Amino acid sequence: NVSKGDICQAVNNGAGDMAAIKSCTRAATGCGGCSALVKQVMEYQLAAQGVEVKKDVCEHFPWSRQEIYHLVRVNHIHTFEQLISRYGQGHGCEVCKPLVASVLASCWNEYLLKPAHLPLQDTNDRYFANIQKDGTYSVVPRMAAGEVTPDGLIAIGQIAKRYQLYSKVTGGQRIDLFGARLEQLPAIWRELADAGFETGHAYGKSLRTVKSCVGATWCRYGVQDSTGLAVRLEHRYKGLRAPHKIKMAVSGCTRECAEAQGKDIGVIATDKGWNLYVCGNGGMKPRHADLFASDLDEATLIRSIDRLLMFYIRTADRLQRTSTWMDNLEGGVAYLRQVVLEDSFGIGEELEQEMARIVDSYQCEWQTTLNDPQCLALFRSFVNSDQPDEAVQRHELRGQPQPLPAEALPEGELPSRPWQAICDLDAIPAQAGIGARLGERQIALFRFGDRVYALDNREPGSAANVLSRGLLGDVGGEPVVISPLYKQRIRLRDGWPCDGGEQAVRAWPVKVENGKVWVGSQQLLARAEAS
């Protein structure tokens, strides 16, 4: 329970960035939903003190998100290493790596698990699924506009039963399957792909769904085919990476059953065409969408959405929804109409071409993964064992599998030998991590530059063995892993948290001989002193 006064007091005491605010107040260290508000309060208090509020994304880049986008686009930069070597410093962090990954995807739309891009991906984008509190993942196949055939429903049901997945219908008119272990994801998706499904991008800062009513095809009140348009929009914009997630909806009449006026892009049918609404939002701070244009034909509607979305991608801040973007846009909706509808900057055709390249280069990330044996090898809980994670336990509730409350399990036995050969060095992705077993103990191996580190795999403060799936980076030059669930920054050399707290992670000695990674069975006991 952190108040505005607590944040203001922290700023008065010298906390000048989000890392410092999180460390001394613990604000925005839970679900992260309040991060934008905390940042706004911090910046307001800094400005009240006469302190210049910098828009630098983090310590590694003295640039705003908009500036990074233009650096990437204008200079044809295709990798994080190219960008940081020319315009940044250090090794990156949990802020700049996903940000740059998103910008690169928005510009060039390359496969996220290419070796140059994999280290930038947070766990959801790295494994193309949404991580849950116990370290398992949820799977969401695409159902454009909520349409699904009887055979498709049967296939989903059979897959859920076969892999003991909890099934739930989402607010976006599709089905979410919970509880998939990391190593099960490829098999689940191979069956889904065989049944005609593709990824629903529920894990990405991208288009989620285009919700719709049944429209004029079935409904006596419908005046246009809302489902048909929603299917077209969803297939056009699927996979589009943006500063934040994008939700759309299409209603077939003014009764508004699809709730289009609460979406980033909303479309409502009229007798003459379609009304376009923009920058609506539900969630923590609801915002009613603005009427942007009326009675558009379908071609003009799509052209307007193309331009608006690409302009949003160019100009929004990091993790800024369209609703907040609009509220902070000088000139508001009138200015946006000038840019998009009247082409006041003369960039309309350019924005359309950028969108066309994204549409033309679409790929189902899971289909690409299933066709690549090297990428499939990354989808395993342990690089040297097929044994499943013993911490993942289930019981039945309301006829479905549910996670058991977390309990402390006895730690696995360590090997009797002083050193255990774990894997080949090349089995650990560069600048990333992978899970392993030291005897029966779960550990995380990290390949940072030319060194390999080993820590316990349990994320502090959780019951999930997921630390190996965290991002690697540095804090003031100190190599760290950023935990995937709660974004805790943990030093690689000794397992100590960088942001305060005394709950350390055990570290284990590592050596690399003839391309083989060995881990010692005697943990590193002493806390390493800061150099």
Show the residue positions of the predicted features:
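Local cysteine-cluster metal-coordination motifs and their immediate loop/turn environment
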Residues: N1-C8, K22-E43, K54-R65, G88-A101, ...
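Short Fe-S-cluster ligation motifs
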Residues: D17-V41, K54-H76, Y87, F128, ...
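Flexible, glycine/charged-enriched surface loops at secondary-structure junctions
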Residues: F80-Q82, P98, L112-A116, L165-G171, ...
